[in-house]
């Protein structure tokens, strides 16, 4: 194997390989990182489409979810499968995914998660009227569950079947999921078409509960249009816009990234609103990831990653790698504290944890 570019060129300059800047909260040490310019190592001849999401398994392997339909020209003949797996050293292990019997693969891949049992969850965010090249006019209203080797286990919802936020049988363009190990519940950031958190039994797919921003009842809106607001002042709108990411902490708190409203909201497991952090000066809350000890919550912010105290929801500082982070879409951490960044349109990046400073 050797390093090659993704289908969309991934170039890292000497500056990008330097230590990313971390703003430091006064009197408190924060994590520092270094760009890993040799990760991942894509096999020669393999072309990977836009990488929309990344998940890390118990062995430290990185699972990339990409969009093969974004490849153009001759690259299509060398397309990698939608899921590609790389070991901690960046070496390619295997790949799988795509249409199959008994399930509906998403038209536009969006989010991937590995649960504590090793099962793989994924969904998409295609909209019938998005007009994107190479996509059929369908809505991704489903989530899929597989074993690590790609055996189909469960589908929640069906393509093109959503009846809106009150629908308990279908999702509507879900962006992200998280499994709560203590309750075996599936928390869904639902998402692009709906504007809610939806909770299901992770084994049976049975619907359990849902809520909107501040714990309100979620309301329907144009399911293919982004609800955007011109002003970003506390407390913000009473409804979610795009519910783009969700994380459940070890102590049972649920953190929700409300991307277009530029805020992260915290709830208990039953949807009781606790508090929020809003940053109106730039795009905020693209995605969420905990440090391994959950002392820090990393939040996609502008062209970097915000460091937040999940207990107080206080903004502590920012990780700002030079160069290539502008298209950061999803982030994840591994057991060593490294950060993985899926950059739609610009491949992947790994930041190596270098200690506290």
Report each predicted region and the residues it spans.
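Beta-rich, blade/repeat-based domains predominating
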Residues: 45-58, 101-118, 128, 161-185, ...
């Amino acid at each position: 194997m050797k390093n090659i570019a993704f289908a969309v060129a991934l170039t890292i300059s000497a500056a990008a390989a330097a230590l990313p800047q971390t703003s430091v909260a006064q009197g408190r040490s924060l994590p520092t990182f270094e760009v890993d310019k040799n990760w991942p190592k894509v096999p020669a001849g393999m072309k990977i489409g836009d990488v929309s999401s990344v998940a890390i398994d118990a062995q430290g392997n990185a699972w990339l979810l990409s969009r093969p339909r974004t490849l153009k020209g001759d690259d299509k003949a060398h397309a990698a499968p939608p899921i590609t797996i790389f070991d901690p050293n960046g070496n390619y292990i295997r790949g799988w995914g795509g249409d199959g019997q008994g399930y509906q693969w998403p038209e536009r891949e969006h989010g991937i998660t590995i649960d504590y049992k090793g099962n793989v969850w994924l969904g998409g965010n295609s909209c019938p009227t998005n007009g994107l090249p190479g996509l059929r006019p369908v809505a991704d209203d489903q989530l899929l569950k597989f074993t690590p080797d790609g055996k189909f286990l469960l589908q929640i919802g069906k393509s093109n079947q959503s009846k809106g936020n009150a629908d308990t049988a279908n999702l509507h363009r879900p962006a992200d999921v998280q499994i709560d190990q203590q309750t075996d519940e599936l928390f869904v950031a639902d998402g692009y078409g709906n504007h809610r958190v939806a909770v299901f039994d992770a084994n049976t797919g049975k619907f359990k509960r849902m809520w909107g921003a501040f714990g309100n009842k979620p309301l329907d809106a144009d399911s293919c249009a982004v609800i955007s607001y011109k002003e970003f002042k506390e407390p913000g709108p009473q409804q979610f816009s795009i519910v783009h990411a969700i994380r459940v902490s070890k102590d049972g708190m649920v953190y929700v990234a409300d991307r277009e409203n530029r805020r992260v909201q915290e709830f208990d497991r039953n949807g009781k609103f606790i508090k929020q952090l809003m940053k109106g000066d730039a795009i905020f809350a693209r995605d969420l990831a905990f440090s391994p000890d959950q002392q820090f919550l990393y939040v996609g912010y502008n062209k970097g990653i915000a460091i937040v105290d999940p207990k107080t929801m206080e903004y502590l500082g920012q990780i700002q790698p030079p160069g290539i982070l502008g298209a950061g879409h999803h982030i994840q951490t591994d057991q060593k504290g490294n950060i993985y960044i899926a950059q739609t349109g610009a491949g992947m990046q790994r930041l190596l944890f270098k200690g506290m400073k």
